Structure formats: structure tokens, C-alpha cells
Amino acid sequence: MKVLLRLICFIALLISSLEADKCKEREEKIILVSSANEIDVRPCPLNPNEHKGTITWYKDDSKTPVSTEQASRIHQHKEKLWFVPAKVEDSGHYYCVVRNSSYCLRIKISAKFVENEPNLCYNAQAIFKQKLPVAGDGGLVCPYMEFFKNENNELPKLQWYKDCKPLLLDNIHFSGVKDRLIVMNVAEKHRGNYTCHASYTYLGKQYPITRVIEFITLEENKPTRPVIVSPANETMEVDLGSQIQLICNVTGQLSDIAYWKWNGSVIDEDDPVLGEDYYSVENPANKRRSTLITVLNISEIESRFYKHPFTCFAKNTHGIDAAYIQLIYPVTNFQKHMIGICVTLTVIIVCSVFIYKIFKIDIVLWYRDSCYDFLPIKASDGKTYDAYILYPKTVGEGSTSDCDIFVFKVLPEVLEKQCGYKLFIYGRDDYVGEDIVEVINENVKKSRRLIIILVRETSGFSWLGGSSEEQIAMYNALVQDGIKVVLLELEKIQDYEKMPESIKFIKQKHGAIRWSGDFTQGPQSAKTRFWKNVRYHMPVQRRSPSSKHQLLSPATKEKLQREAHVPLG
């Protein structure tokens, strides 16, 4: 008996297999992606015009039907395929076969199960997209929840989340009705990913159900008129006779019209001076926000074009927009002229400062020689001498050094005879028997400058620190009367460390004028660089018109050496 039953079952399976081979084939194009580790139900996707019959489910190309035992994780319950729960490895192809006595249809469906992405409550592949228009109320539907009604035909209770955060159903902004989320007064801020979550009890065990919805807002579908982006009722400076283009940029639909007018008339196609070109750029995302461009080509600006504005019009069946450009004559750009003047003045000032730094001494001396006679005469300062000469004394009677020649002969020859200055030289201008201290003190006070002669020999430095003349002169110059001090180096002095502090201070603050070469050879002229430096530091001298520059000849120098009388220091 058992053998007979097995034989009958085998024959039935064989017949059903043969019948299945004769079935019509169809593939469902939509691939439904669901969350893994949740309960899931798949119906057989029959079209309304397709015949009804007995439904049997198969996995891949298996000839064995899916189990109908509810205890099996994947099984057929009534006409639907159940996954309790679904696993990632369950992804693949399934077939539902519809049979009746005269008809067989085999439908292929694809199922995919995915796990949630890291740090998210969903997987982007499982998203359902839903759209609602703005400025009104609308509802988001939690998909495929009708499969999970209980024995009372009631849907499971839903919990809603936005971007994985619990959503407050306050009946003001959001409210939940069955499998729907009602959104009041839809706005752009409501965009986002919404998740509906529920629990379903199957065979005494609870399983989760999750759907994720991408909420996309739609703009109000209101009729709009075109909008001119540019021009914006403006003026434009153009030269008479020039060639220009006026561009009208319009945002609207491709069916809108944009054109130019001048003096109330549209542009004639045969106008020899004015011509229009049209361009359009479609916006794939929003066809109502495309760009229309109308270019008005003006081959030559005529005087009549300054009288009336050029106006761009854009219109459709919902409205019209207009904007104009008024051509005007160019206004003189004073800013460019001011910039040019400022740049020129800056260059002149910089060059003047540079030239002054290089030729400062020559400029000052030229000014003194050329302009001093025209300036008002100042009140007398009570000074008798232009400079007091402080120099190292030669030790030994009858001996004459280069320093003595410079002090007693060269200095007077150039500064007094050629330049008209008056010098006080101790040993030349004092009288025998006078008190040294009194003479020095009195004549330093009567002098406008203190000239100190420096030599290289170490022995020549000793007089600076110990002589009464140096002490009195420096005191009057630096402390009491504030006389300007001028240092003259007859030779290059490498080290000032052995000099008195007062000399080092003057050297650091004002520097020193150094002689280069041999002053005992060749004639001396006040126009050389050394003497110009000395004259620059000397006070302004109103020279007598009869004074003439004289040169110190070699014969004169020999005579001066023979006649030089230097008192003992």
C-alpha cells in the first residue's frame, strides 16, 4: 500500500513538472529590497488581466516547491511567500507558478535582503521614495504593511523616525493614522529619510518590520511668468560710433518669448544697425527654470540711441516682465587722472628723496651760495668765531708735523680765505701772557662750531683726555652752550677705544669727516668732497663779494712750513 502511494505521488510530481515546463514565462522588473533579520512577505505579482489559479512557489530553478510548513523559516502560507525571518543569504530568484485546468504562468521575481549600514537604522538600498507638494498637507505611506494585519484585520502600531531619531507625533506638525504619517503644511524643512517601525507576532514570536522612506518635496505647480535676471533698469556708458552687445538674460520656460524694443518698436529684421540673436539653455532638473538669452547686436552707436532706452520684454501666457538699459555718453574718469597724478607725485617724491640723499651736501651748499643773500638778515647771535679748532699739540720746540701744517696753514687757507669763515686757533689767535683757561673758555663760547682734529698716532690721543683745553672746550660744547662738534680725521683711525668717552659719543652720533690722500701735495680747493663736507657742517656764512677762492700752491706750502710757528702745548 505504501509503495502504491509513493508511486502515485511520484506520478503527480512528474505530471506537474511536465505541466510547468509548458508554462508561460514572465519576469517581474521591480526588485524589492528589504531589511535582513526581519519578517518579510512576498506576494505573487499577478496583473489584473492574468488568470487566477493555484499558486506554488519555487526557489531558483528547483523543481521542488517551497515548503508549506509554517515552522519552516522560508515557507508558503496561503498564496504568499514568507521569510521568518529573512537572511542576507536568502537573496536570489524565486518563482511563483499559477495553474488552473487550462492555464499555467511562471513569474520570476528577484528578492534582496540587506543589513543596516554602520551608524544608521537602515540601508540605502532599501529606501522607498515618496513625494509630496509643498504648502499643503500630505501623507507618507509605510509600504507593504497590509500583509501583517491581525485576526481583527487591524494593522500593527507604527513608530516613526526621521533620520533615525524618534519623531514627535504632536498632531500639529505630524500625526499617525494607521499606516500613514500625516505631514501638516509640507515645507522644504520636512525633507529627509523617515523610518516606520513595527512588531508582528507570528506563531507566538515577535519579529521586527522596518521600512525607510525618502521624503522629497515638490514645488507648487503654480503658473509662473518669466523673470528677467539682467538687465536691471540700468545705464551704460558707451562711446559714439562704438560697437556693443546688449544681453537680456531670462529665467522661464523654453516656450517663453524674449525680445528687445527701442522707442516703442520691436527690432526690424532688416535693420542695418540693430540685430537680435536668441539662445536657450534647458534645465533638466526643472524645465520651468530654463534660461533664455536674447542678444541685441548694435554695429554702430548713433546719437539717436542716447534719446530712448533699449527695453527687453519676456512674456508667456501667465504674464510679462520688462527691463531697460539707457545708453549715456561716457563721463570723464577723474579717478584715473587722480591715480596717475598720485603715481607721478609718488615717483617724483621718491626720486627727489633719493637724489637729495646722494647730493644733499651739494644741494645745501648751492642753496647757501645762491639764495642766502636774498634771505632776511637774522639778528646777531653774539658769536665772534665760526669755529674753534681743537688739535693735538706738537711736543718739542721747532718741530712741525703734518697736523700743524693742516691746522695753521691749510685750514685758514681754505675756510678763511676761500670760504670767508673766521677761525680761532689756539697758538695763533691768543696773546702772550694771557691766562690759558680764561682764553679757552672765553673763545669757545664765542665760537659757533668746535672742530676737533684727530690723528692716528696713539700718542696723539693722550692730549684729548688730560689737557685743560680739551676739557674746557668739550664742557662748553656738550654741556653748557650746546655747540655743534665736527670731527676731522687726518688719517684712518681703526680703533676709538682709547679715545675719551665724549669723542666716542660724538663719533657714534654724528660720525667723522676723513681726509683721503696727502694734503701737502697739490693745491687745495673748497670745491673738493672733503671740504664740501666740512662746509656743510659749518654755519651759514654771508661771504663778502670781494672774496675769491684761492688755491694752496706747492711753493706756498713750502713757505708756510718755513714760517710755521707752533707754540708748545
UniProtKB/Swiss-Prot annotation:
Enzyme class of the recorded protein, top EC level: hydrolase
Transmembrane segments: 337-356
UniProt-reported outcome of changing residue 131 to E: In CRMO3; likely pathogenic; results in increased function in positive regulation of interleukin-1-mediated signaling pathway due to lack of inhibition by IL1RN; severely decreased interaction with IL1RN; no effect on interaction with IL1A and IL1B
Residues carrying a glycan: 100, 193, 233, 249, 263, 297
Reactions catalysed: NAD(+) + H2O = ADP-D-ribose + nicotinamide + H(+)
EC number: 3.2.2.6
InterPro entries referenced in this protein's UniProt entry, alphabetically: Ig-like_dom, Ig-like_dom_sf, Ig-like_fold, Ig_sub, IL-1_rcpt_fam, IL-1_rcpt_I-typ, IL-1_rcpt_I/II-typ, IL-1RAcP-like_ig
Record text on subunit structure and interactions: The interleukin-1 receptor complex is a heterodimer of IL1R1 and IL1RAP. Interacts with PIK3R1. Interacts with IL1A.
Protein name (record): Interleukin-1 receptor type 1
Source organism (scientific name): Homo sapiens (Human)
Origin organism lineage: Eukaryota, Metazoa, Chordata, Craniata, Vertebrata
